[in-house]
Amino acid sequence: MEKKMFNSLMKIHQKYQDLKQLLETDQILNDQKQYLQIAKEIASITEIIEVFQKFLDDQKVLEDAKTILIQEDDPELIQLAKVEIATMSKNIEEYEKKLLILMLPKDKNDEKDVIVEIRGAAGGDEANIFVGDLFKMYHKWADSQKAKVKVLSSSLALAGGFSQIIFQISGQKIYSKLKFESGVHRVQRVPATETMGRIHTSTATVTVMPKIDEKIEIEINPSDLKIDTYRSSGAGGQSVNTTDSAVRITHIPTGIVVTSQDERSQIGNKEIAMGILKSKIYNLELQKQQQKQSDFRKLAGSGARSEKIRTYNYPQDRLTDHRINFSTSLKPIIQGNLNPIIEALLAQEKTELILQNYANK
């Protein structure tokens, strides 16, 4: 193991011991907020400590076995020492690999909930129907993760689906799992209205943003906002409300426009619209920071129209993620089993981080 990494692990080991002792003091035991904060910090490094302790234990056994080889003349003891050295060396190599991954820099947003925006792009009615299919896919996946889904804003389309839908998913480390969903999703299939059996291609754009919590302050000058109210409408623009409860907010400096009409009151819609706006502004800043990272990690959260990330080919029952050349059966994915593609994308992220880590040394 490299000296720099070993020293870092020793510091984490000492920090772990200090925190464990601190957790048992009367001052912390009587302060629930501090107790939970320290307990959470301990939990965040426990896996590293457990693997590192195994590394240290096996390193000690390895050194003892090497000493036996040098000092002993007994053939049986020498043979046992050789077996021990081979076993411990293999174990240590595996622990080093695990620690390398565990020590990779964490994305500060990984623990956050997400706000997802899906918009129909090329393809007219088919694109809007595809938006609805993607929403159902993410909803089913969220259900499988015991996560909660809340629709924040939606615009129904006459032919089915949505021209746009914005929703929140709340659960455990949701952003870490969905951050690479941003981009252009392409569908190839025969529409129900197609009489000649021709395959049509449509697209939808997906943007995944970390939900901003109260701890993060996003400064928005009220004078930078243009707020309009209007009557909420259903599919095809039909009015479904007799009061101006829907809200449209324009952030003048960035040109970001957000709307909300699904709540019954203007106050409720304004609150939701402001929440979406804050996440969009935060995501904009996040994209600027990601320009300094690897090409693959830049894709998280961008949702740029030029980035065709995935194709859903219905006739061939095939889903392909073009960023990592990953293909699998489409049906399980569209039914909400996103874990195979999520795991493949996260594995690629780890590989990129390891390569980047070595490149910076």
UniProtKB/Swiss-Prot annotation:
The gene is prfA. Keywords: Cytoplasm, Methylation, Protein biosynthesis. Pfam families: PCRF, RF-1. GO terms for cellular component: cytoplasm. This is Peptide chain release factor 1. The keyword Cytoplasm applies. PROSITE patterns: RF_PROK_I. One of its GO terms (molecular function) is translation release factor activity, codon specific. Belongs to the prokaryotic/mitochondrial release factor family. The modification N5-methylglutamine is found at residue 238. Gene3D superfamilies: 3.30.160.20, 3.30.70.1660, 6.10.140.1950. InterPro entries: PCRF (IPR005139), Pep_chain_release_fac_I (IPR000352), Pep_chain_release_fac_I_sf (IPR045853), Prokaryotic/Mito_RF (IPR050057), RF-1 (IPR004373). Methylated by PrmC. Methylation increases the termination efficiency of RF1. It comes from the Bacteria. HAMAP family: Rel_fac_1. Peptide chain release factor 1 directs the termination of translation in response to the peptide chain termination codons UAG and UAA.
